[in-house]
Structure formats: structure tokens, C-alpha cells
From Swiss-Prot:
A zinc finger (UBZ1-type) spans 752-778, 779-805. This is Tax1-binding protein 1 homolog. The C-terminal UBZ-type zinc fingers function as ubiquitin-binding domains. Residues 144-623 form a coiled coil. Phosphorylated in the C-terminal region by CHUK/IKKA leading to NF-kappa-B signaling down-regulation. The lineage of its organism: Eukaryota, Metazoa, Chordata, Craniata, Vertebrata.
Amino acid sequence: MTSFQEVQLQTSNFAHVIFQNVAKSYLPNAHLECHYTLTPYIHPHSKDWVGIFKVGWSTARDYYTFLWSPMPEHYVEGSTVNCVLAFQGYYLPNDDGEFYQFCYVTHKGEIRGASTPFQFRAASPVEELLTMEDEGNSDMLVVTTKAGLLELKIEKTLKEKEELLKLIAVLEKETAQLREQVGRMERELSQEKGRCEQLQAEQKGLLEVSQSLRVENEEFMKRYSDATAKVQQLEEDIVSVTHKAIEKETDLDSLKDKLRKAQHEREQLECQLQTEKDEKELYKVHLKNTEIENTKLVSEIQTLKNLDGNKESMITHFKEEISKLQSCLADKENLYRALLLTTSNKEDTLFLKEQLRKAEEQVQATRQELIFLTKELSDAVNVRDKTMADLHTARLENERVKKQLADTLAELQLHAVKKDQEKTDTLEHELRREVEDLKLRLQMAADHYREKFKECQRLQKQINKLSDQAASTNSVFTKKMGSQQKVNDASINTDPAASTSASAVDVKPAASCAETGFDMSTKDHVCEMTKEIAEKIEKYNKCKQLLQDEKTKCNKYAEELAKMELKWKEQVKIAENVKLELAEVEDNYKVQLAEKEKEINGLASYLENLSREKELTKSLEDQKGRKLEGQSPQQVSRCLNTCSEQNGLLPPLSSAQPVLQYGNPYSAQETRDGADGAFYPDEIQRPPVRVPSWEDNVVCSQPARNLSRPDGLEDPEDSREDENVPIPPDPANQHLRSHGAGFCFDSSFDVHKKCPLCELMFPPNYDQTKFEEHVESHWKVCPMCSEQFPPDYDQQGFERHVQTHFDQNVLNFD
């Protein structure tokens, strides 16, 4: 039958969806629920729908109304699912007497299920009415509706059902309780029988044991009281020991932190000491270099002073000679006029001509000496310019060193402030951490103390309970023994056999049971207490041993800390001594810098005074030269002849050319060093004998740069190369040789300044320092010794010069 139904369901498409509980009629314009079941032969889709069709439909479009079939939740393919749809009343047809049916239509338009036909009819009052007898045993008939009758019946059945369910539950509980009571009674009966047999055998032994247990109980109570006192004492000792251990640990941690800080500070001080030593060596080297430069400047200034002194003496001498020559010229003019008037002898005239020629030659020699003096003066001005440039570089170097010193001091102060701030921060952080640790340890100790206190209270309660139980059992036992004695006396008079059996069954089991229970509980408690006391004694011994170990460790750490403190104090003393030495070095360096500044300022003022005096002497010489040019050579010769005849002051003229007393320090010649100013008179360019004319070209020799290294820093290879290289001729000397005329220096300074490198012209009143800075900007400067090199100097040679400072370990601080 089942196989036939399955085949029929598979073959019939209208049976894939089964509609449940379809009534014969429904009310129009009322809510309608449609219950249907999806069989495993259909796969639901979200576009499937259920429609109400008139019976006799032909296609799926002949529906009256429809609703979308919801997709079932948690649908498993191949399973049966129940679904419900609710049609609203205003979508349903009216009471038209037609038959309708539900149809399930898939999303493809296939009808896969149809219900039984039904109608939409309004309920008539006649059909709904029923007659029934009155429940009050009267002969009256009651007319009611079917719905009301059905509701009454349903209410009655539900009430009866509830009452029956309550009654069934009560009966089930009672039966279960009765069964449990029966089983319990049976078990108790069997247990009581066995217990009576055991207790009868154990009663005699327990009576004796009870006495011994009482004595033992008293002893154990004493022991327990002693043990509790010892436990309290041990707890107090443990708390004190833990506090001491915590204090020692905190002290040890603080000492370790201090030790680490001391080591860190020592390392920092060592690093600072090393850096300060390096700076000290640098300052020493720099001070040496500045002292060398200052000695050179002092020697140059001394030479300039000597030159100025000699030149001043020569200027005074020449002034005297010029005054004497002027007086001689005046006398000779007078004599010449008198001779012309008085004598006409030719011999006298020839003699006078000869004297006049000698006087002219002497005047020419004095003029040449004056020219060379002006040349030497110009050379001195050039030397002054060079010294001013060197002085400017020395000032710049001094300012740079001062700035570096101020920067280093500021950095040291900032570093010290940062170090102090870091120390305070770390100390504050460590103190906070120690406080938190101490709080945590105190909290743990308090918790441990609370636990121990609770445990002691619990043991005290157990002891009190045991003592109460012992007292109660003793009283019960005495009462039972008294009652048993009375029963035994009564049973002797009546029925000895029955009385003995009854007493054995009634009294002995109760007394023996109480005694055995109490004794077993007391034994167990005593064993537990002895175990706890032994454990606490072991803990106390362990804590004592740990405390001893901690004391030994603390002593060791204290000794190590004392040693480290001594070392730290020694390091602090060393650091303070080093700081004092550095402070002394800095003070000495500052004093030396102040002295050097004073010397430089004095030299600058002295050079300014020299330049002013030289300008005055040049202006005086110009005036005197102009006066001499205004007189005729005959008058000069007459004056010289008269002076020579009267005073005999004219020396005989030598045929040798005049020699400079102080050579030109900037002429092109081979010297030992470019800065020493040592010259040889045989190598100086001498002017020709002819009388110089003021119309000749004026040539000013430009001071040449010092291309040699400082003393002690020469490269032997470079010196050998320099010996083979030919010395370039001085352009000023070439100019003199090409003209073949005497050197003449125009003392007037109304000429434009010209840069010797880029040939840029500057006005006469242009600032000398700016002009020197412009000229120096073309030159290469050594970063170590501040030596200057021309712009066309070989780059490799310049690099070799810089490397020589490092090759000879000038800046080696080891």
C-alpha cells in the first residue's frame, strides 16, 4: 500500500503540495489561514505562490487572488515542511455560491498541488442554533449556538483534564515517597540488626577505651592550647621576619641601584675626563700655534720698530743735512756773485766749476738716498699692511676660539642639567616602584595574616564543638548507664531473660554508638591537629633558615657596598680634582687670551701711530723735495762748495752705488722662510747713476704671499721640488730693468687701490680692512694652521700641506 502511494505521489503533480484542514465553507470578508505541506518531491522557490481558483480553472492565470509562498527557514533538501499563509478578508470573494480551491503554483507556472473544493458563505442563524435540556433537572429546553455549546464542552474537558493531571501528580509523589520509605525502613532494619550485633560485641571494649580517650582528650586539649600559642608566636615571628626580610630587600635594592648609579656616573666621568683631556690637548696645541704666531708677530713688530727708529734717525740726519745744504747754497750764491764781480780769472772759474760739479753729484746722491728711503718707507707700509692682515686673522681666530669655548661651556652646563634631570626622574621612578612593591608586599602579608587568623578561629570553633560534644556524650552516657541499671534491676524481678535481651537491644547499642562516634571524631581531629602543628613547625624552621641565609647575604652585600662606596668616593675625588684642574686650565687660558688681546690691541695702536708718523714724514719729505726742485743746480753747487770750504762736511763721493741700509722685504729672492725678513745687500736691485726724473712711471711693489710652511712642518719632498723650481722674477724689478731708470715712489696717496688678483679698482678712501678681506677671499686657507695659499696654487700640494699636520702626529692625543 505504501509503495502504491509513493508511486502515485511521484506520478501526480497535484499531490506534491498537500493542503491541510480545508473546511467546506468559509466566511467572506474574514481572515483565512491556509495550511499546506511541502513534500520532498518539490523544491521550493522564493517566486512560488498559492492562489484561490474557481473550480473548473484551465490555466494558472485563472486565479482569483494569490499570496507569495515564503521560503521556509532552515530548509533541508528532501525533507517535509509545513507552511502557513494568511489571506486578508478584503481580498477574498463574496458569497456567490461558487466552489473554490487552493492551488500551489511554482515560479515556472506549474500547478503542483490543489485542495478540496470549498465555498464562501455567510453563516445563517438557523443553522447555528441547537436545543438542549437544562442542567437544573427541569423540563425546559435551552436553545444555543453550536459554537457556544462547543466552547462549554471544551471548557469542561479542560478543567477535568487539569484536575486529573493534578491528581496523577499527587498520587505519583505519594507512591514514590511510600516506596522510598519502605526501602529506607528495610535498609534501616537490616543495618540496625547488624549494628546491634556489632555493638553488643564492642560495648565492653568501648567502655574501657572511653575512659582512656577522656584522659587523652584532656592531654590533647592541653597540647592543642600549647600548639595554638606556639602557632601564634610563630606567626608573629614569621610576620616580623617577613618585615625584616622586606626591609633588607628594599635596602639591598636601593644599594644595588646606588651601586649601578655610581658605576654609571664613574663611566660618565671617565668619558668626560677623556673628552676634557682631549680638549685640553687641543687647547694646548692651539695655544702653542698662537704663541708661535704671536712670537713671529712680535719679532716682525720689533724689526719694524727698529726700522722706524733707524728711519727716524736718518730722517732727522737728512733734515739737518738739508738745512745745512740750504744754508750752504745761500752762501755759495752770495760767494758766486761776489766772485763774478771781483775775479775774472779762468783758473778760479774752473775751480769753481769743479766744486759746483761735485756739489751737484752730492745733491744727486742725497736725492738717490731719499728715493731709497721712500722706497723703504713704502716697503714698511706694505709690511704694516701684512701685519695688520695677520693681526686681523689672529683676532678672528681668537674670537672663534672664544666662541668654541663658550659653546663647550654651554654644552657642558646643558649636559649637567640634563644629567641631573635624568637622575631625578630615574630616582623618582625607582622610589615609586619601591613604594608600589612595598604596598604589594604589605597587602600580601595582610592577606596571609587574615588567612591564618581565620584558620585559628576555625580550629578554635572545632575545639569548642568537640568539647561540647564530649560533654553532651558524657552526660548522655551517664544517663543511659543509670537507666540501664534501673532496667536491669527491674528485669531481675520479672523476667531475667527478656530483660537482658531487651537491655542488650535497647541500651547498649545507643551508648556504644555514641562512644564510638565521639572517639573516632576526636582521634581524627587530634591527628589533623598534630599534622598541622608539624607542618607549621617545619614552615617555621624553613623561614628561620631563609632568614639566616638572607642575613648572610645582606652582610655580604653590605661589605660589597662599603667597598663600592669607598671606590665611588675615590672616583668622585678624582673627578673633582680633574674638574679643578680643568677649571685652572680654563682660567689660565682665559688669562692668556686676555693678555694676548692686550698685546694685540697695543700692537694695533702702535702700528696706527707708526702709520701716522710715516704719513707725516712723507708729507715733510715731499715739501722738502719740492723746495729743492725749485732751486737751480748752480745755486746748489755754490752752497755745497761754500759749506765744504767752511765746515769741511762734504765727504768724498765713492764710485760704488749706494746700498740700502734695510733691504726690500718683498723683493723676489730666496730666503729661509717667507716671514723672517732676512735679506742680503748684494742681491738688491740698485738704481742707475742718472738723475731720476719725476716724469718716470711710478711702480709700487705688491707684497708677495708667504708660500712656505711653518717651522717644523716642511715636507722634505716639497722642499726638494722647490729647490729645482726656478724662482719667478719680480714684476716690479722687471719693470725697473725694462725702463733702465731709477726707482721713484710717489708719496702722494691719491691713487686708486687695485686688487692684485682680480684687478678690481677701489677708491682711495676705501676701508683698508674691507680691501684686505677682499684680497684674502681669493686665497686658500689651511684649516689647521690658517696659512694662506694663492688661488692658482696646486690642489694636490695644498692637500699634502694639510695632511702634514696629521702625518707628523701634531694632533695626536694618545
